[in-house]
């Protein structure tokens, strides 16, 4: 697939429910192909899954159904009529002209928020088998070049850069960055408090040790 430009409607920001729907459809297409496309009930369960999701959500079927209709209006999902139940499939790879490795990365970022290269490499194993982190990094750079992904500023205490999708609104991005900056400050403060407590404990032990040595040194030898 090429990196040609997509239609403007595709790049209009998604809301949080639409982001979750697309991420779930991408994930389940790769991990449970026998049950894909998904019924509405299966998609609701996937959206509310307690593992591999950030943030956790508790969506009603009506909310998911409305999100599907909005995405269908932008040709990003398609209804597949079935004899027992109607099912839904995504068309994000076609709409954005994504290769399989790019689709897997975007799906992970939609589902789990900002992640490091190592986190993406570990978590992508079920979706796409990257040879190594270098290959994954190359695909991230291509997505960055198309403004589908961005590299986040490193927060205090973080050793690796994190990457985030850019399919949500600018307000969502700012809110997430603010929340993560606050959490980083809290973590740093907590770590600082623990260090101060340890230093105080060490100083106390050193004082007690010095006194013990002094007492032993002043004692008279036994004959």
Swiss-Prot record:
This is UPF0502 protein Avin_04790. SUPFAM superfamilies: Winged helix' DNA-binding domain. PANTHER family: UPF0502 PROTEIN YCEH. It holds the Pfam family DUF480. The lineage of its organism: Bacteria, Pseudomonadati, Pseudomonadota, Gammaproteobacteria, Pseudomonadales. Belongs to the UPF0502 family. It comes from Azotobacter vinelandii (strain DJ / ATCC BAA-1303). InterPro entries: DUF480, WH-like_DNA-bd_sf, WH_DNA-bd_sf.
